[in-house]
Amino acid sequence: VYNHDMSPLLPSRCGIVVRLLAITLCACRPLAAQQVVLPPGFGPPAALGTRPSPVFDAARSALAAGATSRALELARDDYASCLRIGGQRWIDSIAASAMIGECHYELGDLREAVAAYEESLLLAAAYPQWLLAVQFSEQPPRPRQSPPRATWGRTARNTRPAQLPDTVAIRQAGADPRQVMEQGGVLVAPFDQLIRPAEIMRSIVIAIYRQGMILGPLGREAAPLERAAVALAQRPAQPAHYAQAWIDVALGTALWAQGKPDQARPLLTRGLVIGEGLDHQLTAWGLIVLGRIALDAGQAAQAVTYAEEATYAAADELDPRAIEEAFAMVLEAHAAAGGRGVPPAIRGAVAWAERDWPVLHARLVAMQAECLATGGDARAAAAALKEIDGRLLRADPGRGLLGAEAAYAEAILGYARADVRAGDAALATAIEISRPRSPRLFQTTRLVELVVQGSGALSDRQAEALFAELLAPPADGDFAARPLDTLAVISSDRQDAFETWLAVATRRGADQAFEAGEALVRDRWLSARPLGGRRLAIDRLLAADPARLDAAAAARRAALLGNRRDLAATLDGFAVVRGRLAADLLAAKQPPADGPLAGSADDWGKYQALATTRTAYVAALSAGREATAIDFPPLLPAPEIRRRLAPKQLILSFRWTRTGLTAALESRDRHATWEVRQAAGIPVEVAQLAKSLCLFDPDAAISTDKLAASGWRDSAAQLERMLFENSRVTLAEGIDELVIVPDGWLWYVPFELLPITSDEAGGGPLLRDRCRVRYAPTRSLAVAAIPRLVASGPIGIHVGRLTRGPKAVVAETLDRLTQGIDRAVPLPVPDKPPAAVVASVFDGLAVLDDLGGIGSATATLVPGASARGGITLSDWLAPPQKRPGFILLPGMQSALARGLEKGSLPPRPGDDLFMPALDLLAAGSHTALLARWRVGGRTTTDLMLEFVRDASLAAADTPPPPASASWRRAVDVVTAEAPDPDREPRLKQGEQVLPDARHPFFWAGYLLLDCAAER
């Protein structure tokens, strides 16, 4: 074979003859059909050396040494020098492409890696019969005489490595004379070429394995994999030859990657040995794939065995790619099996790898350090981490898998030392390194691209199923086996993928769209929470009453505490001290809000110390491999949501999509969906409603004349027409309670103001007149039925600038609330202990202060006496889990308070209400009252007083009415009275005297969230 790329590699004398002959022959024929006919012996490919070449080996060695970028350069050089037959690459490019893929894989460029692996597989499929042309020795395989290389253990499989020739000749046929005559090209005689067939087969297996790991379910029907599998299924090797074992391993790996583990397992098992119990070059990879099958089947203990056996086989073959993969699987399977401590194989291999395998050694040390820190041996873990060569961490490996594993071990060590700040910083680094290397994130991105591009390879049914699989909440075992990848996935912004899923699901059916939309909203909130909501989920689980948990959650909680007696003791002590402090606060009877804390200083010191210890435990558990579910917000199937609805209880939900606005009304036995035709006009009409309600300045006083003359009913009627004109539903009758799940701009709409019929002139009944109304951030939370707290502790009341007047008025307001509400006491807001820790003692919380917008985590929830005091929303979400079953924030503001002017809107309209709504429910409350705009004054105080009176009656034998009924009653009672302009900071007396406070400015800004179980 000869081509111009090879000419520098030919002997000069031979090259001159060949070139002269080529010129002579070409001159004798038209240029359109140039041919070169070489007699046997000219341009022998043997002059090019063995394939894969030594450059291939150099690239692999560079990878093992940590010089990843240099390895990629070498792999590309090797690829450029690979043989060609005409314009077609030869089989040595199979190995070269796979090596390029390995380099990109280590560098975290999964897209380029997949492209290289796919080329490798397509080349393998293009030469399906090449093994038949290999001139293998007729000698049967013999056992290798050298001792096993692994020092950390011995195989239990009763096998020995085989002594097989590395290099053999392959008979390559010459070019087809007829094809050369018709199409032009080079005509050569048959020739022999030295190759390393095991290396090529190993490259095929690696390419298939990586495709399976990187693409997962997305690659099961990929064309390159399918073509390679078809070629391997022909079993293109001599019968009864040991090359058949290579085919078994390769074909078994392909079947596994195609999602056919039952077909793969027997082939892989048979392909592990040749002859009389001899391992071969692909045995390690066969064991690795069997380990993957065992892990996928939940057989973690068996996977540990396969992985350990793979380390022995890989060491015997000096296969650095297999041995790194095998040891990574040892730890993964060990953790998935619930193993404790350092796996013996990892502990024993550290010294073995130190001299010749720098990257492997560093990765093993990082794994060992993680296990030691998890087990509580912080000193040994710190000593282990110091063994990692800093030069590696500053080079390519430090930006790759090694860097992620070392940073993760550093994080676990930080948490073991109760240094949460250091742990969080190291964990953030580990996640940042892991994110571009996450197969799940790559699969998700690729699926979105396929759908958006309109790929014919996927039907809507297939795409919807893949989205449901890839975007599903992590399974319990995901954290145990792959904590970093799982944390990287759940903390990433995947809204584009969820939006695409929703678009596909909408074409599939109503329930599919319901569930995709529910998952989208849930992820929008979770991805903005620390560690994708995992830290909060663990804190909620630890704080929960085991008697009120379902069986699965109770078992997870018991497992968390089973091996952590210190944590169990911390939780018990925390509850005991909190009980004493709650009793002390109640017994103090009206302590001054800014005076000394009721209760002993010793108890408050213990409480803060226990809270700090608990916080460190929660941080460590959330970063670790504990098998826990993220169960808030709940994610229920659409039929289950409807099943939980009571008779005459309905859910009205909305969802903004890329194409518009979808609405749905669901009852226990039916549902209706429709597209809002004038969706583009909704923001304009909501802004018009705000204007009609005199909302333009969040602090300005509104004249009674303006309120009396406002035309809010017309705006509300127009909104009602726009939202329901394309539906066949009516809200006029047959509804006891309506649960509204807004989205986007509709969070700013007080649905209570919508008219229930368009037949009457202004002044007809409103939605609130016909049914109880409450809101929920998600449809699942609308029926979540969170158990009510049996209230017996204090209810904290904080009064600040929400009322007009001097301190005496503030004191009077505080006194009215504490006297009018059972167990109400002023909420202390000290600097020490932290105010959020103090507030966690209370059973309920009402904050009557000017809070502004609380859409961000750093926004103030409860103002403090000093600049550093108070409680932020992130404080409230942080451990320890807060106790208040209800929280009232009438001093909150949203963008609606400024009339929805552009500068006031969050990046996604409505998030200034949606995010804090979920935050407050997640922190432990089952009921929350937010404000779209602040009113303040006597009316606000009376509304809160009347509402909380019902909520505070939640004793074991006297359950309160539903929150929506309590709120409706409070509005009816309070707004029937005339407002006093002297006690209303947002009201200015004009010529018009308001006979009552029924104008929606006074009450419609409040948004009641409730998901408490009705006993």
Region spans (language model):
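Amphipathic alpha-helical segments of tetratricopeptide repeats
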Residues: 76-84, 119-123, 128-129, 229-236, ...
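Catalytic cores of nucleophile-dependent amide-cleaving enzymes
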Residues: 777-787, 841-844, 848-949, 953
